[in-house]
């Protein structure tokens, strides 16, 4: 079957192939059938959508396909119905609770990347892993397969360090301080980060306030070979592409199987050649991991997986019961991070965590004796060496190295919530703070977010400011104010909690 390509201005998040009803009947195609589109050495798989989007003799390709494959308007292609992929049989095997062999896992991952597996089959895979789990051999095979089906970064400058936080705590701009400290010590740390998905700001969103984060692999290699570090958006790269497709399904199912989470994180580390990896697991009420028992179990899995991958992994279990620093939102966090790097001083929760993590990396990389890493990291921060390194990173990635905190625009539509009673701050709800910042417009509106005026344990008087909401529009500010009043994210109590006596 042959047809001319018609490029449609449609983006669905899927590889959709649009067929005219007359052709579909003649070719015996049905909605959601899997077909192979070929032209020369190029081939893609897509799901059939039948409709009058195209004329008879045409095949419509969505923009999703054009993002990944180059087809031209009017190009003649062949269309072939595809049989059920062999990987479906392996998914059924996992649904029965059986262990998958390495070659079976590789086939599944390849079929996900080639779009032979659609969301229905990927959903079955995710559910099977949620119910039956993966052992460490399966997770290691999955991690390597996910990495090797995408691009791989080859950096000559060794050793290659990496740090990753599993997230869940608002205001976590820690790595913007950790990376320049580690690089200033002479180690190599090519840091790829994500944008916010459910948070108010991913590291990439924050860094983008003062420099470009969308770079190619060649650009990253050049920068890292030259200055030892980068802070870029991993989503602009073809690193572990199967991961993005499975994550999309996981979110829709509200599932996060541990085996997939481990493979998701470590596949990207494997792809960029990381040799020494520090995993940060924030733990506490409102964080992704709420108990020490769960944190230790997860840490053990990361370390064991690292051994199987030939990577040395250490894990830091950190306090995650309240936001890090005083700011939540891209521009607010960028301002706070830059101030800390410039002055060598900043909020205790931010500085101490950054120095603690950087110190561990310095010890892992052999540039600081065991037990002395934090001290060395502090010297690098306070001496201004880390600030000079962040300036290099900013400049190499296309930003202004002389940018100052006061140059960063913050949302000028503001509203401050005040204490309704006197007492002590006994809790700050991470999820509520994140929700308010997002309602104000973060992360899309860079200047939107929340600035805290108090932290847990501090004494407040009635009328004292608790936090200020920043927005770029009055409408977003109004919505955030309504949400803030409903959620009441900061809890204040007196020191006397209850009085008992004789009845």
Curated annotation (Swiss-Prot):
Entry keyword Ribosomal protein: no
InterPro entries recorded: AMP_phosphorylase, Asp_de-COase-like_dom_sf, Glycosyl_Trfase_fam3, Glycosyl_Trfase_fam3_N_dom, Glycosyl_Trfase_fam3_N_dom_sf, Nuc_phospho_transferase, PYNP-like_C_sf, PYNP_C
Disulfide bonds: none
Keywords from the UniProt entry: Glycosyltransferase, Transferase
Gene Ontology MF term list: 1,4-alpha-oligoglucan phosphorylase activity; AMP binding; pentosyltransferase activity
Annotated Gene Ontology cellular component terms: cytosol
EC numbers, comma separated: 2.4.2.57
One Pfam family per UniProt: Glycos_transf_3
UniProt cross-references to PROSITE patterns, sorted A to Z: THYMID_PHOSPHORYLASE
GO biological process: AMP catabolic process; pyrimidine deoxyribonucleoside metabolic process; pyrimidine nucleobase metabolic process
Active-site annotation: 256
Residues annotated as binding AMP: 168, 194-199, 203, 264, 288
Swiss-Prot/TrEMBL catalytic activity: AMP + phosphate = alpha-D-ribose 1,5-bisphosphate + adenine; CMP + phosphate = cytosine + alpha-D-ribose 1,5-bisphosphate; UMP + phosphate = alpha-D-ribose 1,5-bisphosphate + uracil
Function: Catalyzes the conversion of AMP and phosphate to adenine and ribose 1,5-bisphosphate (R15P). Exhibits phosphorylase activity toward CMP and UMP in addition to AMP. Functions in an archaeal AMP degradation pathway, together with R15P isomerase and RubisCO.
Family: Belongs to the thymidine/pyrimidine-nucleoside phosphorylase family. Type 2 subfamily.
Protein's recorded name: AMP phosphorylase
